[in-house]
Curated annotation (Swiss-Prot):
Residues 478-515 are annotated as: Disordered. Its main location: endoplasmic reticulum. This is Protein disulfide-isomerase. Disulfide bonds join 54-57, 389-392. GO terms for molecular function: protein disulfide isomerase activity. It comes from Aspergillus niger. It is an enzyme of class 5 (isomerase). It catalyses: Catalyzes the rearrangement of -S-S- bonds in proteins. A motif (Prevents secretion from ER) lies at residues 512-515.
Length: 515
């Protein structure tokens, strides 16, 4: 399972550390003997903790190497540690998955790397880490700073306006991982940029190249503006940008197209629409050859392109555009407006509702979710699973056994439901980040489900339902009493949990398969 998780001395000549460097590689290999001294001699280091067999590590390797080469010129070293050879070192650094990327400012000061795992993102992120939260601007470095990153925010603030500067500096501190910030109190520089003091200007390498803030100097207002101004009118969805779009707080419109030429044409066609609805929805193209499978997640035919769909992450809602229609910008704009106005019902992917329930575990589909999980006065434990998930398959017999504890007793079944839903074949209201995910929806508090993270034994799951459900049903006690009543006095049979449920092993604990 993956987990995610200046002032530098030159790498050449200045370091007394002997670090094993791979041939013709700018990524430096460290071990137990070299790690501490290297970190203490370098003011800023990005470290990758990896395993040679790890697929994600192999995918990252060439990008990490390219970033190391580019950052070497800026005296920002990138290092790596093989955790299969350095188990103690990796354990001491809290490594729980591969690859783990950490930023070090000395051996005792580290934090997780939070950027994308792409060359450009690694370089941009680490450059921002090497600079102060707010860099100083003068006539000589203005143009260099304006183009130092894809997004640069500069405050033109007079020296006597400390209130505005302090608000700007505070915001910069909170967002230094995401944007590059600078400031100047020179009125002449502000004038040369066509702005009056105080002003905040966002420079970018796309669209209109710069935007000037005209709102209140307040953290939330500034942040909302920066997020909006830094988003292209029509961008491109990929590994580097996806999380930003999903976390933007507004719906996202996807334009699936197979060729670069098509995507460029749609970009131009949709720019006026994006400008009209800026701040209400983001619009972006996506390479259908590389990421066409994602169309299926939006309830589109993933074999038919071009295609268009809107996703509202806040509502977990999807609005696919009719693929039988031509993808005409003017017609699609009407669809966008109708979605924003609430005139379009979201598309819900669902398996057929079972005609009858077979077995102790209740099968839930999207169209029965509300009735079986939400609109009732029962404590409902729901497993979100995927058919291909190994951990889900391992859980299945124990989950059946758990469900039988309740289903075999009408008085318990009236208060507790043990259920499952195939989250790959049915749309579910809340995001699922791994399989299996187990959530308890207590009676009277369905809007506050409780996610289970303990060992997946029958006993522990039953106790979880008892302790967190409204009805506090103790199914284990009922089962134990029945066993004792039906067994021989001198040689009582062990309970179901004693006979069939071994102590949890490491593999039985709350592992998840990646989505």
């Amino acid at each position: 399972m993956r987990s995610f998780a200046p002032w530098l001395v030159s790498l050449l000549g200045a370091s007394a550390v002997v670090a094993a460097a791979d041939t013709e590689s700018d990524v430096i290999s460290l071990d137990q003997d070299t790690f501490e001294s290297f970190m203490n001699e370098h003011g800023l280091v990005l470290a990758e903790f990896f395993a040679p067999w790890c697929g994600h590590c192999k995918a990252l390797a060439p990008k990490y190497e390219e970033a190391a080469t580019e950052l070497k010129a800026k005296n920002i070293p990138l290092v790596k540690v093989d955790c299969t050879a350095e188990e103690d070192l990796c354990r001491s650094q809290g490594v729980e998955g591969y690859p783990t990327l950490k930023i070090f400012r000395g051996v005792d000061s580290s934090k997780p790397y939070q950027g994308a795992r792409q060359t450009e993102s690694i370089v941009s992120y680490m450059i921002k880490q090497s600079l102060p939260a707010v860099s100083s601007v003068n006539e000589e470095n203005l143009e260099e700073i304006k183009t130092m990153d894809k997004i640069v925010v500069i405050g033109y603030i007079p020296s006597d306006d400390q209130e505005t500067y302090q608000a700007f500096e505070k915001y910069a501190e909170s967002q230094r991982d995401n944007y590059l910030f600078a400031a100047t109190d020179d009125a002449a520089i502000a004038k040369s940029e066509g702005v009056e003091q105080p002003s905040i200007v966002l420079y970018k390498d796309f669209d209109e190249k710069k935007a000037v803030y005209d709102g209140e100097i307040e953290q939330e207002a500034i942040h909302s503006w920066v997020k909006s101004a830094s988003t292209p009118l029509v961008g491109e969805i990929g590994p580097e940008t996806y999380s930003g779009y999903i976390g933007a707080g507004v719906p996202l419109a996807y334009i699936f197209a197979e060729t670069k030429e098509e995507r460029e044409k749609y970009t131009e066609d949709f720019k006026p629409i994006a400008q009209k609805h800026k701040g209400a929805i983001n619009i972006a193209t996506i390479d259908a050859k590389m990421f066409g499978a994602h169309a299926g997640n939006l309830n589109l035919d993933s074999q038919k392109f071009p295609a268009f769909a809107i996703q509202d992450p806040a509502k977990n809602a999807k609005y696919p555009y009719d693929q039988a229609k031509e993808l005409n910008a003017d017609e699609v704009e009407k669809f966008i407006q109708d979605v924003l106005d609430g005139k379009v019902e979201p598309s819900i992917k669902s398996e057929p509702v079972p005609e009858s329930q077979e077995g102790p575990v209740t099968v839930v589909v999207a169209h029965s979710y509300k009735d079986l999980v939400i609109d009732n006065d029962k404590d409902v434990l729901l497993e979100f699973y995927a058919p291909w998930c190994g951990h889900c398959k391992a859980l299945a017999p124990k989950y059946d056994e758990l469900a039988a504890l309740y289903a075999d007793h009408p008085d318990l079944a009236a208060k507790v439901t043990i259920a499952k839903i195939d989250a790959t074949a049915n749309d579910v209201p809340d995001p699922i980040t791994g399989f299996p995910t187990l959530r308890l929806y207590p009676a009277g508090a369905k809007d506050s489900p409780i996610e289970y993270s303990g060992s997946r034994t029958v006993e522990d799951l039953a106790n979880f339902v008892k302790e967190n459900g409204k009805h506090n049903v103790d199914a284990l006690n009922v089962a134990s009493e029945e066993t004792q009543e039906g067994g021989d006095v001198t040689e009582a049979a062990p309970s179901a949990t004693e006979a069939e449920t071994p102590a949890a092993t490491d593999d039985e604990k709350a592992e998840h398969d990646e989505l």
